[in-house]
A protein has these predicted regions:
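Conserved beta-strand scaffold positions in the cores of enzyme catalytic domains, especially
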Residues: 15-22, 34
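P-loop NTPase motor domains
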Residues: 2-11, 25, 33-237
């Protein structure tokens, strides 16, 4: 109805234009609504992911801080990933839980989050022999991790004491839902998702919802390949 009435308004007045946006991909007469993901802030993503508790907001904030580090051409990406993974693993190793729980949680983290330097297959070298990280998680007959000190010292080598997200200059880059999903996962482990069942329950749901969105047809509304500023985006509307 509006298209019929206003579609040719520029023929009547060249200073006036008519444009429509739609979320229906089958509508060939309108532009598909597209919102660059990096223009969304914490509150926007909270609405998008149906946040239900204030405790979930810091996780979104952390994900937004990490996505610019983990995406793009930063030469230190691997160092940052190693630091985040190492801190999460170290928290587990020093948690005081039973050895079997510590081992299982460390294996779970390093199965999902790893780099070529920090993984279950990473080589730990000692005089006379070399073992993988996973082999060093052996539990003896008394129920203790035999190489706890060795593993802890190895993990500590990846922690950057001078790494502070707040000190990094803000980067403006394009990123996708998949990129944000990766950043969200790293934010979850950095927030200690495995240390508490309560934290896991309210935190993991964010990852689940973001994953569902990234793999649904609705991802097209957030797909953008090139960076565009907020002002430019608004000018093009």
């Amino acid at each position: 109805e509006y298209t019929r009435a206003l579609g040719n308004v520029d023929n009547v007045n060249p200073n006036m234009h008519y444009k429509t946006y739609t979320t229906n991909p089958d509508n060939v007469n309108s532009e598909i609504l597209n919102i660059p993901l990096w223009l969304l802030g914490v509150d926007d993503l909270a609405l998008l992911l149906d946040v239900t508790t204030p405790n979930q907001l810091p996780i979104i904030e952390k994900a937004l801080s990490l996505v610019s580090i983990l995406t793009g051409d930063d030469p230190d990406v691997i160092k940052y990933k190693n630091d985040i993974i190492a801190r999460a693993v170290l928290d587990i190793l020093l948690s005081g839980h039973q050895s079997t729980k510590i081992r299982d949680q460390v294996i779970a983290v390093l199965t999902k989050f790893n780099t070529k330097d920090l993984s279950l297959d990473a080589k730990i070298v000692q005089p006379g022999y070399v073992r993988t990280f996973k082999q060093c998680l052996y539990i003896d007959k008394t129920g203790k991790l035999m190489e706890m000190e060795l593993v802890v010292n190895f993990v500590k080598t990846f922690i950057m004491d001078d790494f502070n997200l707040e000190d990094r200059p803000e980067k403006f880059i394009a990123y996708t839902l998949k990129d944000l999903e990766t950043a969200m996962d790293f934010a979850l482990i950095s927030e200690g998702i495995l240390k508490s069942d309560k934290v896991y329950d309210y935190a993991n749901v964010l990852s689940v919802r973001l994953h569902a969105l990234a793999n649904s047809p609705n991802h097209v509304f957030f797909d953008s390949n090139a960076y565009i500023s907020k002002d430019t985006y608004l000018d093009r509307l």
